[in-house]
């Protein structure tokens, strides 16, 4: 990739997004997120050679929220392998990310690891055999290792805010517990879940952490394999089909990349073999995904010809 072209494209898109009046609405159901400035926008692209193109608020930390689910799934697969799929499916949900009705209909087995119920089940698997603090420490250290940055932390205020208001997540967890899907005390599993969703990262840190998914499971920064090639491809497949809740089809249609969103306004996207991409714009669309984040990524893939479906 020509680094000058990449720098120019990222700067151009960041400037365009700064001028757009349609910014979506910040997540209001988590009090700590409700006060985030909707004018913020950051974009970072790290290509296969390690060149970093950054625009806007690229180094401002934000709450990654559900983007953490990509990394907890990666950890859980490393710990338990295919046993993960006894607890959670691999199909798009077609429902809201916190739907209770679907969970009831399917006897406590979540559709995929990226909706809330699925991520809670994955968190429970990581927690097994550990104290909550140990499990959470393992998740945080994994994120720091991938990004090569020990300054990444959990925003305790956001975690506390989610714990105070996370009644629907508690309902999901208790429902799964009633079907034997969860092994650990619900309050322990939820505590770890709320805290890993409250990890704060910048676009630069997030793009660094996601590089292994763009390079067949290998972290180019260290040269070490994080996961196998097959596992990286399968995680990317789930990101493409399930990474944006019931907006996943629209994201695939418009952007054409595997991606995972969070209600903090972040999106981690993967251009296989080409780049790891992180974008942040706090305003959300009706499906709970970053409004300008999707528009920016669509512009990026169109201008660079990076859609996995061809130019």
From Swiss-Prot:
Keywords: Hydrolase. It is an enzyme of class 3 (hydrolase). SUPFAM superfamilies: beta-lactamase/transpeptidase-like (SSF56601). It comes from the Bacteria. Substrate binds at residues 66, 116, 162, 169, 193, 245, 263. Signal peptide: none annotated. GO terms for biological process: glutamate biosynthetic process; glutamine catabolic process. It holds the Pfam family Glutaminase. InterPro entries: Beta-lactam/transpept-like, Glutaminase. One of its GO terms (molecular function) is glutaminase activity. Coiled coil: none annotated. The keyword RNA-binding does not apply. It catalyses: L-glutamine + H2O = L-glutamate + NH4(+). The keyword Chaperone does not apply. Its EC number is 3.5.1.2. Belongs to the glutaminase family. Homotetramer. This is Glutaminase. It comes from Rhodopseudomonas palustris (strain HaA2).
